[in-house]
Amino acid sequence: MTGGGTRLSRRRLLADVVGASAAGLAGCSASESEPNGTTTAVETDEARTLAERYAPVLYFDANERWFPTDPRPYESERDGDPVVSGFDALDGYSERRAETRVPEPTVFYNVRSYAGSPLTVVQYWLYSAFDQFTTNFHWHDWEVIHVFVDTERDEARLHVASSHSRRVPNNEHLDPEETVPRVLSELGSHSSALSLNEERESFQRVSIDGVPADITNRAIGGLASLADVPAAYGLPRDEGFRLPFVVPELDGAPVYEHDRLPAVTREDLVPERLTIRSFDDLSSPPTDLPARETGVVLDFEGREDPEGEEAYALVPAEEVEHVDAFTGPQLSFEFAVPGFAEDAIDGHLTATDPPWTQARYEDPAADITDPTHRAALAERYDAVGAPGSVGSLVASVTEAVTTDDAPAGEGLTTRESSVEAVALLESDPTAVPTFGGALVLRDVPPGEHRLTVNRAGTAPFSQRVRVEDAGSDSGGDSGETATEDAKPEDTQTADTTTTDAQTENTTADGTAESPPGVTVAGADGEIPLVAEGDAVKLRVDAEGTDATLTDVAVEDDFAGRLYDAPVRGSDAVYVHRGGAYTTEVRDDDGAVGAFRVNPAAESAVTIDRPRTGKASLASFLADVSRETAATVREATEGEDGGGSTDGGGTDDGTESDGTGGGTGPAANAVGGLTRSLEAVAASADRAAERAESGDAPGADRALEAITDALGRAKERLEDASDELPGPAANAARARLDQASRRGEQALAAEKL
């Protein structure tokens, strides 16, 4: 249809989110969508009228250094063509800013009308001389705000405020009540958030206490933990989160020391209290970074009742289109990628292109990142193509810390961090920040990627993920993605596959099934980072193994699965030294191996030539049983019970007649538990020996007996639980459950 439709309510929009089509849930790409109609430039007078009517009010952070300005004073020539040099712009702007708070505030507008449609779009382009952020920083920064207008109904249909790169979902609002968009600019990066309710100086992601949200982006699909979080970048520093800024360097030195920037001083960058020199300078994430505060407010100079104390000029974008290029040596940022031996430092470059060279300059609908918004406009206007479907990558980035529920140094939990992280795909040079701990990468091409996540003060995380062609199995109607192929049911690795369901479902354990087109990264969608001071590198050295390893997973006794990824040969992951871990490996035949890891004070732990099959799993049973017996003894030292055992055990997995060192019921209960555990360990040793010698029937007999013995050990644990400190009892339960699962795997294993 070409006319306007009915206004969508917030409730209706949320209903559409829950019941959205596969394409909507997939995280659609404008480049993969149906083509939009062509646009033409609106005539000068009409364009000016529309631009003045919808001109945004711009709210800046109190620490902002680079306000929207006119780049033309910094023009020069290169080979006869007009260019703007990064050195000239930054140095010249800094010099002018020493004399006036906001040098030549300017906003450029570009108004496009879709052919044969009442849909017209007013674009507001904001140029800043520099961009300083937590990762990406560059000379010249162009940001855009779109107002989609129905000229027949004379009302705004959609506000779109750009957020970082095309990988990040924009802040968008369908059918806004407010005609004039109020925009909150992110410090340093100038990413734009919307503020359309009565709380003018803050961003509100969801409706609270009757105050409507500032965006109508649909919820994040694929993770139950993020099911209520709208997929929009927002404004993290205004939402209770922190972003440490990094000082940009050129030729190994801070930019303010460069001889071509004589007017630039340290004070011309984001203040020191908000910055760090590098992410690995800290032993833990920073907790003392100040929150966002409103500073300069800019309003259109022609508005009768302006909100701000400063005013900007509104200039047609065509007046600056003659500039051939915005130049400057590429700045880089350091990004740590975990390696088996040493971590690599990837220097990734960022750049900015002039607006008039970008597809969205003439086709603004290409910048709609929310599929439900695009679908709504496509239903109302023939000029907008229906959304398509390509891969999206999602995860929740948390932090791993010790838990009081476990013995000291033997267990973790994960929790939300107040410090945002940044992610990088090996295939893309632009890093993407999280928002509220949510990692959302849009328009990820099909194929295998390496995802790396950094956070200030934490060790880096990296894993391989595979994104399928979103429409490969469904004629292009919906997508399907997975981190790796489905695994055998007898393993404990969590896999990500998609189904034909049209809405997101939740499994019995609370894990959301991935909607079509969504790849869930991490372990069950969670990426727990470890503070640098607590990090231990866990290496899996596959060199010399007799099988090809395909997957590695790491599970803490209390926090559960923390790492789960496909691998190519050797692998490395950082773990918290306060955890107690089971490391699982899988080979290309589907055989599983398991190993206990207790890093404690180690700087690195290596699993050499990991094996898969019965022998590996039986050896694991021996290790975890002895470890649990030691935990029980240590917890009861100095108390009645828990005395020594003869370390024996019979071939059927029962304990010998050793009596231990204590007397009374408590001694019997605790002593019986430790004897049961050590008997299991001794029998597991025999099972491993038989498997290694090729005696499969003998190994299975020992494993069957161990299964029964583990059941008795669990009974004795409950008998002794009143005499054990809570953390020790908790650890014993978790490890016995782990041993039972691995025992079943060992029995089912065909490989010795």
Language model region names:
Residues 456-485, 490, 500-523, 588-614:
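Structured interaction patches on ligand/partner-binding surfaces of diverse proteins
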Residues 135-146, 152-392, 415-418:
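Domain-length functional cores that host ligand/cofactor binding and catalytic or interaction surfaces
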Residues 405-418, 424-445, 557-571:
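Short, acidic Ser/Thr/Gly-rich low-complexity loop/linker segments typical of extracellular
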Residues 447-457, 578-589:
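A short, solvent-exposed beta-strand micro-motif common in secreted/extracellular proteins
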Residues 391-401, 532-545, 550-552:
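A short, amphipathic beta-strand motif
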Residues 618-752:
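Long, charged/polar, soluble alpha-helical segments
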Residues 2-20:
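N-terminal secretory signal peptides and thylakoid transit peptides that target proteins
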Residues 70-144, 148-158, 422-424:
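Short N-terminal edge-element motif at the start of the domain
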